[in-house]
C-alpha cells in the first residue's frame, strides 16, 4: 500500500507539474516473494506492472535457499519465492535474479546458477556476503565451483551474464579510487519514520534500532548532517575508498 501511495503521488505530480518523466519511470525493487499472492500485492502488480521492475530473491536450489532464508515460523521459504518468480515470469516476463552466497553455501553455487539460467534468466547478479570470515580454503572451493560453472556456461549459455564472472573482477585497480558502493552515503536509505541512513544495511530493519542510531544521518524533517555527530559520521563515510576497504 505504501509503494502504491508513493507511485500515485509521483505520477499525479508529474501530471500536475507537466513533468515528462512519467512514461520513462521504473519502480524497481526486490522481494522475498512471501506475500506475493496477497490481494494487496497483486493489486499493486496489476496496477503498475508496466512501470515495475521486480526481482524475486532466490538464492539458488531449494536446499540452499531453505537453509538460509526462513519465515517467521522457521520454515524454508523457497516454495513461496519460487512460485512468485514463476508468476512474475509467466505474466510479465520478469526474470531478474539476485543470489547471495556465504562459505557454507559455496557447494551450491554451480547448481544454483545453472538452475536459474535454465529457468530463462540471462542476467544473474550474484556475490558473496561481506560479513563472514573467509579462509584460503574457502577461496579454493569458490574457484573450483566457478570453474565448473564457467565450463557449463561456455557450452550451454555463452551469451548469458553472471556478475561474479564479470571480466574486471580480480584485475588491478584503476586510478579511480572512489567507493563503488552507494552505501557510504551516496545513495541514502530512508526508514518509514523519515530518518536517513547510509544504506539499508545500516537501517533499523537490518541491524536494529540501537546500532542504527549511531549512523543516522538526519531525517526528512530535520535535514541531513545537522548535528556534530552526524557530520562526523559523514566525514568517516567520505574517507572510505576502494583501497581502504581492501587493506
PLM regions and their residue ranges:
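Radical SAM/AdoMet-radical enzyme domain recognition
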Residues: 2-128
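Flexible glycine/acidic-rich beta-alpha junction loops that bind and position SAM and/or redox cofactors
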Residues: 63-68, 123-142, 162-176, 203-211
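Histidine/acidic residue-rich metal-binding segments in metalloenzymes
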Residues: 82, 141, 145
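C-terminal accessory region of radical SAM enzymes
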Residues: 144-172, 202-246
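Short, small/polar residue-rich loop motifs at catalytic or cofactor-binding pockets
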Residues: 181-185
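Short, acidic, Ser/Thr-enriched surface-loop or helix-capping motifs
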Residues: 191
Amino acid at each position: 500500500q505504501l509503494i502504491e501511495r508513493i507511485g500515485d503521488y509521483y505520477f499525479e505530480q508529474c501530471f500536475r507539474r507537466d513533468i515528462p518523466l512519467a512514461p520513462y519511470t521504473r519502480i524497481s525493487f526486490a522481494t522475498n516473494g512471501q506475500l506475493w499472492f496477497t490481494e494487496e500485492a497483486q493489486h499493486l502488480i496489476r496496477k503498475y506492472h508496466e512501470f515495475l521492475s521486480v526481482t524475486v530473491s532466490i538464492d539458488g536450489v531449494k536446499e540452499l535457499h531453505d537453509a538460509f532464508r526462513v519465515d517467521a515460523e522457521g520454515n524454508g521459504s523457497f516454495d513461496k519465492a519460487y512460485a512468485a518468480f514463476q508468476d512474475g515470469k509467466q505474466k510479465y516476463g520478469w526474470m531478474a535474479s539476485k543470489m547471495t552466497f556465504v562459505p557454507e553455501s559455496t557447494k551450491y553455487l554451480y547448481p544454483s546458477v545453472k538452475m536459474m539460467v535454465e529457468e530463462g534468466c540471462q542476467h544473474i547478479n550474484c556475490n558473496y556476503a561481506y560479513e563472514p570470515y573467509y579462509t584460503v580454503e574457502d577461496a579454493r572451493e569458490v574457484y573450483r565451483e566457478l570453474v565448473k560453472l564457467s565450463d557449463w556456461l561456455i557450452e550451454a549459455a555463452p551469451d548469458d551474464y553472471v556478475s561474479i564472472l564479470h571480466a574486471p573482477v580480480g584485475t588491478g585497480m584503476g586510478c579511480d579510487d572512489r567507493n563503488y558502493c552507494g552505501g557510504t552515503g551516496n545513495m541514502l536509505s530512508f526508514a518509514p519514520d523519515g530518518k536517513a541512513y547510509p544504506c539499508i544495511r545500516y537501517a533499523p530493519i537490518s541491524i536494529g534500532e540501537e546500532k542504527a542510531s549511531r549512523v543516522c544521518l538526519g531525517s526528512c524533517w530535520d535535514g541531513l548532517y545537522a548535528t556534530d555527530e552526524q557530520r562526523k559520521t559523514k566525514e568517516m563515510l567520505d574517507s572510505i575508498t576502494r583501497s581502504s576497504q581492501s587493506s
